[in-house]
């Protein structure tokens, strides 16, 4: 966070003539630095402080560093940090709006694959940078975490409306998703709004953790896995149709265990293999639909309930589930549980499910029961 404050303070006063693309590039750096400051503080807050749902009150947990140089900073309350993160994200959003929305093409290949030669390379591959759409998605995430449902919905709706016009962040393209998986699109990167770039580290880690003993007998292999019992509980009757089960998991040990393939190194000669090997997902369009669904669902309001269901169905249908069963839903809590259930399939290995449980003050469980 301190480094980001340093970057933005320099960008604020720098002469635009120093930059290849002059003031556009200066503003891009400034907007990204402000957004990254909020992003990193928010993740630290989620990690080290209780969620608002746990009533942290006036206790203090982490500082919010917005000045450089800064040597010693007082810890602040959860509400203080959230207020400052929201303010930073709104300012970042304002600065980046013209830069990214004026682009005529923000499709997945432009975001993550197509490199640009020369000085223009700095402004390319915006999916690996904190672009306007990513800032908007993160602002929706922060608002929901803060319990500000109306504001969370408003930000999510901006992206949903954009997606309906441009199809930049395809969360619902079920007619080609299965072929994408087969051609190396294991992380569904077209759905990712913002990612980190990792040339080999992530696939190397997966190789060491999950595939080092592949040559041994089934009973002697070591890997991270889901149990069949856990999978049945999470996927239920949708299991056989869900692309995330069919393509992102591999049956092991006679069907008792299932190993994740999300980070398995893809063949780079396939259509999507190289891009998927390098991507670490940070926020997806599917999460934006989850946010909108949870935020708009209002008990007793049939129109809002129908709208909320349509957002969840966008994600599910894009994952091969053509019919969604709502027979277990009689309250908002039931509906939120459905969202959480789908998010567990969507986000495994991405670090978001834990914070969803924390935000909702839900108990974590495993095969043997509750996790302390």
Task: Locate predicted features.
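Short, cationic low-complexity segments
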Residues: 214-232
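Acidic/polar-rich alpha-helix caps and helix-coil junctions
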Residues: 3-210, 235-372
């Amino acid at each position: 966070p301190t480094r980001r404050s340093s970057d933005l303070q320099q960008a604020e006063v720098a002469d635009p003539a120093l930059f290849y693309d002059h003031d556009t590039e200066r503003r891009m750096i400034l907007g990204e630095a402000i957004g990254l400051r909020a992003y990193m503080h928010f993740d630290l807050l989620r990690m080290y402080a209780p969620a608002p749902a746990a009533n942290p009150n006036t206790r203090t947990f982490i500082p919010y560093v917005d000045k450089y140089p800064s040597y010693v900073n007082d810890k602040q309350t959860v509400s203080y940090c959230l207020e400052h993160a929201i303010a930073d994200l709104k300012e970042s959003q304002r600065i980046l709006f013209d830069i990214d929305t004026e682009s005529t093409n923000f499709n997945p290949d432009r975001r993550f694959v197509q490199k640009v030669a020369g000085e223009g390379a700095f402004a390319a591959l915006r999916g690996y940078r904190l672009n306007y759409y990513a800032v908007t998605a993160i602002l929706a995430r922060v608002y929901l975490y803060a319990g500000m449902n109306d504001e969370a919905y408003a930000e999510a709706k901006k992206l949903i409306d954009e997606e309906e016009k441009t199809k930049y962040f395809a969360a619902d393209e079920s007619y080609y998703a299965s072929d994408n998986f087969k051609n190396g699109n294991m992380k569904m990167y077209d759905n990712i709004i913002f990612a980190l770039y990792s040339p080999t580290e992530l696939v190397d880690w997966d190789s060491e953790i999950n595939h080092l003993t592949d040559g041994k007998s089934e009973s002697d292999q070591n890997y991270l896995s889901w149990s069949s019992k856990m999978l049945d509980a999470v996927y239920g009757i949708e299991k056989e149709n869900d692309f995330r089960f069919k393509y992102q998991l591999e049956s092991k040990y006679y069907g008792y265990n299932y190993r994740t393939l999300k980070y398995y190194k893809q063949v780079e000669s396939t259509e999507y293999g190289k891009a998927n090997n390098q991507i670490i997902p940070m926020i997806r369009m599917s999460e934006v639909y989850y946010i909108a669904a949870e935020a708009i669902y209002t008990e007793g309001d049939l129109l809002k309930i129908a709208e909320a269901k349509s957002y969840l169905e966008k994600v599910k249908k894009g994952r091969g589930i053509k019919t969604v069963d709502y027979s277990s839903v009689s309250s908002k809590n039931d509906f939120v549980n459905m969202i959480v259930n789908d998010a567990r399939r969507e986000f495994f290995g991405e670090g978001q499910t834990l914070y969803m449980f924390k935000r909702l003050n839900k108990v974590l469980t495993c095969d043997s029961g509750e996790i302390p």
